[in-house]
C-alpha cells in the first residue's frame, strides 16, 4: 500500500484553472424528458391504499406508477401554475404516460400496515412521503436504506407532519424490490424525481421535500467541501496548499465535474431550479460518469480526523466510512502531522510527500504485515454524502 499511496498524494498544484473545466458532461435539464403518469380510471381511496400496500412486492412497478399518477393529478401548486408548467419552467421536457389498469387485490401486500393508516384527509401527504422515501433507493443501497429507516425516517417524517411513514416496511427484501425498479434512466425514476421538483417549487411543500429526500439526492459532494473548508480554517492553511496535501490523482476527474456543476448551479434562479440542475445529472444518460463527483472516502477520513482535533466528536461520523483499518490509522497520523505542519501559520513546513512518508512510518504497527503493502483501490462510500449544507 505504502509506495502506491505515496504516489497518489501528488496534489493538484500543476492543474491550472481551465483544465478543471469539464466540457464533456452536460448538466442541463433540457436534455431530460420527465414522464407525467396518468390513469384513465378514477382514483378512489381503496385503489390508492391497495397500491401503497403493493409497494415492495411483485407489483411494485405498477403500484408506484399509479401512485405517481395520483400525486400528479391531485397536486395543485399554490399559485405557481400547473404541474406541467412548473416542470417546463425548470427547463425539462415532458411526456404523458398511462399507468394501465388498476391493481387487483392480492396477498402480496408488504406495505399493508402503512396503507391502513391512510384516510381521505392524509392520503396525498402519505403517498407523496412514500414516493420521497422510495426515491432514496436510487442512491442508497439496501443496507444504507435500512439504516436510514431505522435511525432517521421516524424523526424526519414526524417533524414534517407525516408520522404515518413510521409504518413503512424496511425489510431488506422489500427494499431490494423497490430499489430494483428505481434504476437510473428508468421512466418511473424520472417521474418520481419530477414529483420531488414539483414539491420543491412550491413554498408550501419545499421544506418537506428537502427534509425527506432532496438534500440526500442532490449528490453535489458538498459534505466533503464543507469538511475541507472547516479543516483549512482550523489549520490556518491556504485551501490550495491543503488541497495539495490531500488530493489524489483519482479525484482529478471528480474535481472537473464538480467545478462545472457548481458553476451551473450558481447560475440557476431559485431553489427548485438549482435542484433541477443537480437532479438532471442523475437522470441523464451520462449518470454513471457524472456520478463520479462522489466524495472520496479517504480524503473525508483525513479531514474528519483533522477537524476532530479542534472539535472533539467530529470523527464519530467515521463509523460508516468505507476505508480499510490500516488507512484509518494512517489518516489519524496524516491529520496529526498536518496540524503540526500548519499550526495556524499557513503554507509553511514540509511538503506533502515527506508528510505522507512520515505518517506511513508512524502508523505502521508491529501487526501490519506484507499483505498491507499492496495497492488499495479508492473506496468511495456507497452513500455519496447528504448534501444538507447546500441550501
Swiss-Prot record:
Residues 368-391 have a biased composition (Acidic residues). Pfam families: Rhabdo_ncap_2 (PF03216). One of its GO terms (cellular component) is helical viral capsid. Keywords: Capsid protein, Helical capsid protein, Host cytoplasm, Phosphoprotein, Ribonucleoprotein, RNA-binding, Viral nucleoprotein, Virion. It is found in: Virion; Host cytoplasm. Residues 347-391 are annotated as: Disordered. GO terms for molecular function: RNA binding. Encapsidates the genome, protecting it from nucleases. If expressed without protein P it binds non-specifically RNA and therefore can bind it's own mRNA. Interaction with protein P abolishes any non-specific RNA binding, and prevents phosphorylation. The soluble N-P complex encapsidates specifically the genomic RNA, with protein N protecting the genome like a pearl necklace. The encapsidated genomic RNA is termed the nucleocapsid (NC) and serves as template for viral transcription and replication. Protein N binds protein P in the NC through a different interaction, and can be phosphorylated. Homomultimerizes to form the nucleocapsid. Binds to viral genomic RNA. Belongs to the novirhabdovirus nucleocapsid protein family. This is Nucleoprotein.
Amino acid at each position: 500500500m505504502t509506495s502506491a499511496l505515496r504516489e497518489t498524494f501528488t496534489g493538484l498544484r500543476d492543474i491550472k484553472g481551465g483544465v478543471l473545466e469539464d466540457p464533456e458532461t452536460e448538466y442541463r435539464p433540457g436534455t431530460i424528458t420527465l414522464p407525467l403518469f396518468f390513469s384513465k380510471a378514477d382514483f378512489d381511496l381503496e385503489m390508492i391504499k391497495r397500491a401503497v400496500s403493493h409497494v415492495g412486492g411483485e407489483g411494485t412497478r405498477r403500484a408506484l406508477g399509479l401512485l405517481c399518477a395520483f400525486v400528479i393529478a391531485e397536486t395543485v401548486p399554490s399559485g405557481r401554475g400547473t404541474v406541467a408548467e412548473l416542470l417546463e419552467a425548470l427547463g425539462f421536457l415532458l411526456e404523458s404516460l398511462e399507468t394501465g389498469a388498476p391493481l387487483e387485490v392480492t396477498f402480496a401486500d408488504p406495505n399493508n400496515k402503512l396503507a391502513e393508516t391512510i384516510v381521505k384527509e392524509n392520503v396525498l401527504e402519505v403517498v407523496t412521503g412514500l414516493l420521497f422515501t422510495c426515491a432514496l433507493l436510487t442512491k442508497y443501497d439496501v443496507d444504507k436504506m435500512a439504516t436510514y429507516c431505522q435511525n432517521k425516517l421516524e424523526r424526519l417524517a414526524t417533524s414534517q407532519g407525516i408520522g404515518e411513514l413510521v409504518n413503512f416496511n424496511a425489510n431488506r427484501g422489500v427494499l431490494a424490490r423497490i430499489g430494483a425498479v428505481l434504476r437510473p434512466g428508468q421512466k418511473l425514476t424520472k417521474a418520481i424525481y419530477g414529483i420531488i421538483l414539483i414539491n420543491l417549487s412550491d413554498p408550501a411543500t419545499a421544506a418537506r421535500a428537502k427534509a425527506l429526500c432532496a438534500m440526500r439526492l442532490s449528490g453535489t459532494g458538498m459534505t466533503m467541501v464543507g469538511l475541507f473548508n472547516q479543516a483549512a480554517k482550523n489549520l490556518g492553511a491556504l485551501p490550495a496548499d491543503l488541497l495539495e496535501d490531500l488530493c489524489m490523482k483519482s479525484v482529478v476527474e471528480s474535481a472537473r465535474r464538480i467545478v462545472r456543476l457548481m458553476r451551473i448551479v450558481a447560475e440557476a434562479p431559485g431553489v427548485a431550479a438549482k435542484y433541477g440542475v443537480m437532479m438532471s445529472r442523475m437522470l441523464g444518460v451520462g449518470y454513471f460518469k457524472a456520478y463520479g463527483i462522489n466524495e472520496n472516502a479517504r480524503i473525508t477520513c483525513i479531514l474528519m480526523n483533522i477537524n476532530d482535533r479542534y472539535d472533539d466528536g467530529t470523527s464519530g461520523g467515521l463509523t460508516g466510512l468505507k476505508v480499510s483499518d490500516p488507512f484509518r490509522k494512517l489518516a489519524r497520523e496524516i491529520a496529526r502531522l498536518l496540524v503540526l505542519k500548519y499550526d495556524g501559520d499557513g503554507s509553511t513546513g514540509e511538503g506533502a510527500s515527506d508528510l505522507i512518508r512520515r505518517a506511513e512510518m508512524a502508523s505502521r504497527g508491529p501487526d501490519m504485515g506484507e499483505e498491507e503493502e499492496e495497492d488499495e483501490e479508492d473506496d468511495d462510500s456507497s452513500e455519496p454524502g447528504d448534501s444538507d449544507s447546500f441550501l
